[in-house]
């Protein structure tokens, strides 16, 4: 199923601001980016996009309350600086199984002042 269609199903009888957890694992990202997620998900605390085909995350909306972000098993190789701006309260980040090859890419995560755990297994 495509990512934006899964989000539509998750919203059944709810508004985006009612959603605290959103699991989009194995949904297909047609253009390699996050699709269907907007800054209306202002209460979102947990987002999982495991194995969805992401290549970049620059279009991630502002998610001030997001604490845990699962991005494993995608094709992300950069763009991580956007996380400090869009997800300032992020505590747990899983980037395992992506295409991060350069330590300078990870250096940008220093701006995530609340980050407690970072998974980079098999990058």
From Swiss-Prot:
Report each LRR repeat as a residue range. Answer: 43-64, 65-87, 89-110, 114-123
Q: Which Pfam families match?
A: LRR_4
Which keywords label this protein? Leucine-rich repeat, Repeat
User: In terms of domain of life, where is this protein from?
Assistant: Eukaryota
Q: Which SUPFAM superfamilies match?
A: L domain-like (SSF52058)
| UniProt family annotation | Belongs to the ANP32 family.
Give the protein's recorded name. Putative acidic leucine-rich nuclear phosphoprotein 32 family member C
- Name of the encoding gene: Anp32c
């Amino acid at each position: 199923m495509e990512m934006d269609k899964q989000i539509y199903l998750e919203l059944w009888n709810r508004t985006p601001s009612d959603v605290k957890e959103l699991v989009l694992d194995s949904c297909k990202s047609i253009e390699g980016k996050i699709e269907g997620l907007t800054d209306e998900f202002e209460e979102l605390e947990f987002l999982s996009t495991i194995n969805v085909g992401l290549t970049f995350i620059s279009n991630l909306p502002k998610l001030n309350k997001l604490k845990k972000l699962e991005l494993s098993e995608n094709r992300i190789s950069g763009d991580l600086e956007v996380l400090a701006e869009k997800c300032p309260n992020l505590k747990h980040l899983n980037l395992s199984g992506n295409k991060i090859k350069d330590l300078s890419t990870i250096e940008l995560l220093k701006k995530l002042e609340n980050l407690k755990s970072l998974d980079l297994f098999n990058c």
